[in-house]
Amino acid sequence: MRRQKIEDRSKKIRGGWFSTLLVLVLLLSFGTMPVSAQSIGDVQMDEANLYAMTKQMGQFIRRFNYEEDQFGNKINPKDPAYRNKQKRQQSMSILFDQETYGNQPDLQQYFIEDVTANDSTYMTFLGGRWYSEVSATFKYNGKEVNLIMILGVEKEGLGSKWVLNNIYFSEFNKLFPTGDLTEKEKHFLHPMSHELDFMNIYKIFKEPEVAEYYASRSFEPNYLTLFFYEIKKGHLVFQHVDSVKFHVFQIKDWYFEVSWFNRNSSNAGWLISNLIYIPEKDKKDLLKFYEP
């Protein structure tokens, strides 16, 4: 009943769907640290705001689980306050961008109630289903272009590492347009082609722009392979990172983005910038972009 109520209300509140997934945000940038203030990029912060700020993604995870309080104090696992349900409910709102969710308190509150219920849900670094979106500038055949890299955390021996999962690059997408089904059906090799020593195979190469129409219906272009190929050939040259954000699917029936907010406020740093109720059965197709 509680989950049905959340689903019904969140459908009314959220308004949009998943179109904001690839919207870019500011890159995390640290400055110097004076005694009573710190410069975060171009923003001077007072000491109180600096402590309240969620400065690292690891800190976001600890605060989300209430393994660290809003003042930056880590909580001992043996302490009764560790992952305390009530304290977690009271403090979790600091992890939302309140300039956005201050105007949508219902959705924020339903999320907090859901993740702090008796079957509480926590984030874990090695729990899978959370990804980093790194927007970067490259030179492609001498011209500056934007490219998005999707990274995930992978276990490595006793530790872990970030690995490239997927690439979004408009130039690659142009190579494999979706195409009209009727048009695709015009491009095929006759089932008796083998009896003619595949003399008609030239058809595949006559129109190279649609050569993939002759592949199996299960064919999916691998953009990560194209990415590595272009790098190895020297056609694609890295310049710099422009922005970073995170996409979190770990929480049952929810998706949220975590973006960097650079401002002199206690509500700053890594914060939830987009929250959507998504039943688990609907996540499967979305996750194909993050783990093809």
Q: What do these predicted regions represent?
A:
Residues 74-159:
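Short N-terminal edge-element motif at the start of the domain
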Residues 123-125, 237-239, 261:
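Short, exposed beta-strand/loop patches in secreted or surface proteins that constitute
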Residues 14, 123-124, 136-139, 233-235, ...:
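Intrinsically disordered, low-complexity segments enriched in polar/charged residues with Gly/Pro
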Residues 45-66, 125-178:
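Long, acidic/polar, low-complexity amphipathic helices and coiled-coil-like
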Residues 144-203, 209, 242-292:
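Short beta-strand edge/turn micro-motifs at domain boundaries
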Residues 1-51:
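Bacterial Sec-dependent N-terminal signal peptides
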Residues 225-241, 245-250:
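Long terminal regulatory regions of eukaryotic proteins
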Residues 39-107, 175, 182-231:
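Core segments of small alpha/beta cavity-forming domains
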